Amino acid sequence: MGYRVAVVGATGNVGREMLNILEEVEFPIDKIHAIASRKSIGVEVSFGDKIIKCEDVAQFDFSTVDLVLMSVSGTFSKEWSPKIGAAGPIVIDNSSAWRMDPDVPLVVPEVNPDDVEWADRKNIIANPNCSTAQLVVALKPLHDRARIKRVVVSTYQSVSGAGKEGMDELWDQTKGIFVLGAPPPKKFPKQIAFNVIPFIGAFNDDGYTDEEAKMWQETHKMIDPDIALTVTCVRVPVMVGHSEAVNIEFHEPLDEDEARDILRNSPGLVVIDQRHDKGYMTPKEAQGEFPVYVSRIRNDPTVEFGLNMWVVADNLRKGAALNAVQIAQLLHERGLLNQAVLAG
């Protein structure tokens, strides 16, 4: 027997990927609904070998489903997630709206799976920011072994993190440069083709962007509030796949060989780390894949106990849709989905 599942925001990059992954992992589904805004009513999306038409979020009866995956804006989620949760189903929300709410668990299943047990406070579970998701999967097993003191991260984030408009802008500018000149930027503040932009989101008063703040706030909530973490987030002209250069300082001794072994034996991680010119992972190779990949693991000789590493993942998958589906699988394994429906 399967569940009744709705995907809200089904026409976007992440919403479509949610549908793809639900089918790929054979999540037990009796009935699937694609939900979108009024302007997308009737738009067709695929679910395995089936084509389903989008239904209107304003008219849909959410008491008829057990689980809702949300891929919408934070503003939309702030309005709709509480309404949907009150109707009975558990909402797994991919926006930033609920991540720091003390009554909403922020979950990466490889990192803090037990937090799903208190999802019934609001019937909402938050998905972390895409760049945070891959980072914490790599940090958690090392923290468990040697207690992380400080982390310095530089991200190299693909344009798909800004949605279809971001991908279209990179494509149009790249083509345009070789024909009539690049069209002016619309989605990004400056030209993204053949360029990098050290700015994602909006500036805060301290000079950091909200994208950078999300990473340390979310890491603190999921792993340990005592970890000192500083971040620079950069948009790069890559379609799909986020990369991160990560420097870690530990309280306790941990060398590169032991770290490599720990990471190899940790869930959700694949270590690709050979010291030749192709012995590392790139975002292109990670596209379409489930794991978080770790490469370039090496000691940092500038501190007593330190490491450097390179972390890569498909941001539309582990950074968003896959993590949401993995949370759904965790709820299923623990028998929490049916409990939510009965409580509603």
Residue ranges of predicted features:
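N-terminal Rossmann-like NAD(P) cofactor-binding subdomain of oxidoreductases
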Residues: 1-192, 228, 261, 275, ...
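Glycine-rich beta-alpha junction loops
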Residues: 38-40, 130-131, 155-162, 196-203, ...
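Helix-loop-beta segment of a Rossmann-like dinucleotide-binding subdomain
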Residues: 119-126, 195-206, 309-311
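Oxyanion-binding "anion nests"
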Residues: 192-239
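C-terminal active-site/capping subdomain that shapes the small-molecule cofactor and substrate pocket
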Residues: 227-344
